[in-house]
Amino acid sequence: MNWKIAFVFVACAAALVAQKPRVVTLNVDVENAVTYRFDVEDPAKRGANPNLTTTILPNAFMEGIEVDDIVAVNGKPAKGVHAIRYMRMNFSPTPSPGQAIADMSGSFGDCNWYFQAQDGKFVGQILDGGLTVPHVVKGGAGAFYAATGEHNWVPDPARPTRNASVSEDPSRRRELGGGRYRVLFYLVMESYPEVEMTSQGPAILHADDWSLVNPTRPARAGELLVMRARNLGPTTPAVPPNQPFPKWTGDPLVVVNSDVEVTVNGAPAEVLVKAGWPSEVGVYRVDFRMPSGVTPGMAALQLTAAWIPSEEVKIPVR
């Protein structure tokens, strides 16, 4: 191998090794957490008791399902459900009779997370599981397409997860009450929300004439701007990821399901439109009004969708 080619190969390999994956943190708050243990054999009796129930302390091989409500993500109101299907083995290096011996403590389960925006629209799903925390994130859909990573959890000692019999009516879970806790996701995404870039900078346009925001035509406080963005997640109506958004024929635009936020120098901007860009594949339109009082100069702009922030971009402001 030519020494110059070898040098380039080694340099590129070193650069790839040096690159660290970008990790996104989601702090997910859940409430009304109830674990239903399969302590009743008769199917006719399952879910039939409208009253608060108790259950037996499980030995190994006890199956159960936990159901929780997602109420917030990163401090912002959200909706959704978290469901765990588990096999209680009670692994322990020093097991009591009826427990499973192992070199670690815990059990194992498979978790399913279904995230919704405040208005109930679908944002994304995450699948994870493991023998004990941290659980392994196995994948995702929607805004979390192909996500990997892990999660841990922080219990609330004042409101632990409630254990119930599978005979209890699950339609009354919120009325009867349950526990609450926080799950900390650390995700590596296949793609992240981003502001599209051009050779002259971010693809952010003046709404009055569709010219590019640049040093000769900077943005102004209070001005309406239009951003070209990518990776904002599912829309209504739904459009497959590899298909163009519908042509605009005067009908309402295809709207992004997740909450979309824009900040300029940390100040929130008013988002007026969050939609698929007609006839384009994977490009979204975000119309926003510049906040008042933005300091002239180069301003840091950041886009957030599905609680995932973009990298900051810089735009000139006068």
Descriptions of predicted regions:
Residues 20, 36-38, 54, 58, ...:
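A sequence-level detector for low-complexity, Ser/Thr- and acidic-rich stretches
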Residues 1-7:
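Bacterial N-terminal signal peptides that target proteins for export
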Residues 103-171, 288:
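Acidic, glycine-rich flexible loop segments
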Residues 165-191, 263:
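N-terminal targeting pre-sequences for secretion and organelle import
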